[in-house]
């Protein structure tokens, strides 16, 4: 063990992963988290890694970008993905978790680590440059610290408006109407589906558009812009009569056996719903259900009224209503190196959603990289970048100054980006079939990361300070 302590500010997904990686490298960590003493507009607990939006980490299959990212994280023994696997709930082809058990387990694991010192205080300023620090405060960074970050960077923060979906009690839905199925019968029938005919859909859309919105502060109204990957359902409804039907309410691939023979074309065309609202388990028992894709800024009374129009949800009881909040992120291409160090202070790192990555697995990946590099710096080594061929490497390259694409686009400001196969380098041999090409990307990534990990293991083990905690 070495004496130099690394400070990690924020115990969300990125901060939790970073703290775990650092401590397991034999480096002491001070993990600073302001909750529960000071909360945010979206959090409800003081637990680490609380999931405030969806409970899904995205597709599991490695021929999907999110699935490859999860696979890469497993190679590096990611605490976040290990914990997600342990508390997974059925979600078809996706990795979804019981959010309460997930965050409770993260908190317990980190609290019991001998090299992690937890401080439940609000961080009001950036530590001095003598301290190795990881900024993992997330999109809901407190105002005081956000102002200090702006002073340090000299750049106003970027922001967008994000929203969370409502959660309802599973025993309050009508199972005579709602049916269980996964799209195209992929995996277990993990979703509950509320079918709508054309009249029901049209009425529901009209009510959504006319529904009364929760108030935004004046400064928020002036600069309101939504993140396209997490639009409020009422905003989607306003974009066109069929926009919801080709988005979160699409019915294709979903079939209730009560409707008869799926392979009878006439029957299929006659019985197929005009739209379907999906519900996903929040816990293994299905006592709590998330309304998939139903992020909203409707007033709570309007949510209860309008969402009860949905067939099968006429008597729905709400555990949590949807909320909208302002998310802050850095203009990373102008500020960060691919190692996630700040260009103007290499002892300071940023990780997670504050860097402009989108999605839970991507946040964990940022924490993983920042944690590894903070450990290396603490040991007197040089920070590393992940291979370009990996999803982690390509994503971090894209948000950093190493990739000039975003910073050179003066008309289009930098916006959060999810993992995507469009970010990774092309294969040397062209593969026309998309699925086969993505599988080839996956195999290439695994191959290069296994080599990369062996090199890292050598660096961490050469002074015999690597700590392994089961």
Curated annotation (Swiss-Prot):
GO terms for cellular component: cytosol. Its EC number is 2.1.1.74. This is Methylenetetrahydrofolate--tRNA-(uracil-5-)-methyltransferase TrmFO. Keywords: Cytoplasm, FAD, Flavoprotein, Methyltransferase, NAD, NADP, Transferase, tRNA processing. Catalyzes the folate-dependent formation of 5-methyl-uridine at position 54 (M-5-U54) in all tRNAs. Pfam families: GIDA. One of its GO terms (molecular function) is tRNA (uracil(54)-C5)-methyltransferase activity, 5,10-methylenetetrahydrofolate-dependent. It is an enzyme of class 2 (transferase). It catalyses: uridine(54) in tRNA + (6R)-5,10-methylene-5,6,7,8-tetrahydrofolate + NADH + H(+) = 5-methyluridine(54) in tRNA + (6S)-5,6,7,8-tetrahydrofolate + NAD(+); uridine(54) in tRNA + (6R)-5,10-methylene-5,6,7,8-tetrahydrofolate + NADPH + H(+) = 5-methyluridine(54) in tRNA + (6S)-5,6,7,8-tetrahydrofolate + NADP(+). SUPFAM superfamilies: FAD/NAD(P)-binding domain (SSF51905). It comes from Prochlorococcus marinus (strain MIT 9312). GO terms for biological process: tRNA methylation; tRNA wobble uridine modification. It is found in: Cytoplasm. Belongs to the MnmG family. TrmFO subfamily. NCBIfam families: gid_trmFO, PRK05335.1.
């Amino acid at each position: 063990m070495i004496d130099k302590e690394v400070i990690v500010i924020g115990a969300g997904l990125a901060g939790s992963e970073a703290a775990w990686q650092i401590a397991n490298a034999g480096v002491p960590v001070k993990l600073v988290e302001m909750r529960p003493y000071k909360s945010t507009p979206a959090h409800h607990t003081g637990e680490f890694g609380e999931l405030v939006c969806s409970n899904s980490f995205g597709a599991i299959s490695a021929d999907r970008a999110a699935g490859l990212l999860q696979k890469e994280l497993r190679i590096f023994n990611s605490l976040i993905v290990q914990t997600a696997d342990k508390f997974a709930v059925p979600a078809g082809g996706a990795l979804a978790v019981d959010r309460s058990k997930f965050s409770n387990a993260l908190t317990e694991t980190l609290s019991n680590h001998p090299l992690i010192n937890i401080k439940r205080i609000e961080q009001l300023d950036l530590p001095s440059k003598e301290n190795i620090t990881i900024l993992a405060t997330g999109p809901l960074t407190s105002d005081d610290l956000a102002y200090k970050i702006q002073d340090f960077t000299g750049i106003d923060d970027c922001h967008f408006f994000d929203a969370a979906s409502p959660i309802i009690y599973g025993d309050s839905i009508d199972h005579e109407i709602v049916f269980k199925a996964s799209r195209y019968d992929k995996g277990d029938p993990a979703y509950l589906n509320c079918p709508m005919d054309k009249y029901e859909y049209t009425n529901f859309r009209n009510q959504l558009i006319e529904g009364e919105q929760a108030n935004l502060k004046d400064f928020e109204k002036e600069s309101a812009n939504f993140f396209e990957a997490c639009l409020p359902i009422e905003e989607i409804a306003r974009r066109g009569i069929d926009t919801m039907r080709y988005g979160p309410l699409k019915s294709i691939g979903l079939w209730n056996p009560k409707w008869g023979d799926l392979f009878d074309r006439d029957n299929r065309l006659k019985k197929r719903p005009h739209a379907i609202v999906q519900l996903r388990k929040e816990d293994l028992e299905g006592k709590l259900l998330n309304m998939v894709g139903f992020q909203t800024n409707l007033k709570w009374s309007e949510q209860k009224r309008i969402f009860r129009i949905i067939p099968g949800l006429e008597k729905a009881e709400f555990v949590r209503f949807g909320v909208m909040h302002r998310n802050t992120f850095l203009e990373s291409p102008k500020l960060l190196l691919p190692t996630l160090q700040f260009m103007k202070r290499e002892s300071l790192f940023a990780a997670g959603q504050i860097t402009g990555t989108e999605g839970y697995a991507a946040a964990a990946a940022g924490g993983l990289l920042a944690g590894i590099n903070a450990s290396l710096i603490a040991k007197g080594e040089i920070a590393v970048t992940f291979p370009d061929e990996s999803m982690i490497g390509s994503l971090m390259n894209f948000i950093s100054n190493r990739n000039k694409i975003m910073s050179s686009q003066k008309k289009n400001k930098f916006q959060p980006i999810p993992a995507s196969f469009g970010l990774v380098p092309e294969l040397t041999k062209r593969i026309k079939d998309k699925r086969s090409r993505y599988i080839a990307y996956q195999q290439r990534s695994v191959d290069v990361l296994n080599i990369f990990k062996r090199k890292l293991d050598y660096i961490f083990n050469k002074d015999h300070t690597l700590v392994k905690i089961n």
